[in-house]
């Protein structure tokens, strides 16, 4: 999930998305 979502579709990549897309 891109666009500033802190809750990605993939829990495993949650820490990645939270850093890059928050």
UniProtKB/Swiss-Prot annotation:
Q: State the tissue distribution.
A: Expressed by the venom gland.
What influences the activity of this protein, per its activity regulation comment? Answer: Inhibited by aprotinin and dithiothreitol.
User: Which terms are listed as keywords in the entry?
Assistant: Blood coagulation cascade activating toxin, Disulfide bond, Glycoprotein, Hemostasis impairing toxin, Hydrolase, Protease, Secreted, Serine protease, Sialic acid, Toxin
Q: How does activity depend on pH?
A: Optimum pH is 7.5.
Thermal profile, per the record? Optimum temperature is 50 degrees Celsius.
Entry annotated with the keyword Secreted: yes
* Catalytic activity, EC: 3.4.21.-
* Record-level Gene Ontology MF annotations: serine-type peptidase activity; toxin activity
Q: Does the keyword Membrane apply?
A: no
Which cellular component, as a GO term, is one annotated location? Answer: extracellular region
Annotated compartments: Secreted
Boundaries of every Peptidase S1 domain copy: 1-22
Q: How is it modified after translation?
A: Glycosylated; required for activity. Highly glycosylated with 42% of N-linked carbohydrates composed of Fuc(1):GalN(4):GlcN(5):Gal(1):Man(2) and a high content of sialic acid residues (8-12%).
Q: What is its main location?
A: secreted
**Biological-process GO terms, alphabetical:** proteolysis
Q: Which family does it belong to?
A: Belongs to the peptidase S1 family. Snake venom subfamily.
Chain's role:
Thrombin-like serine protease which cleaves specifically the Aalpha chain of human fibrinogen (FGA) to release fibrinopeptide A. Also cleaves rapidly the Bbeta chain of human fibrinogen (FGB). Is selective for Arg over Lys at position 1 of the tripeptide substrates.
Name of the protein in question: Thrombin-like enzyme BJ-48
**Natural source organism:** Bothrops jararacussu (Jararacussu)
Record lineage: Eukaryota, Metazoa, Chordata, Craniata, Vertebrata
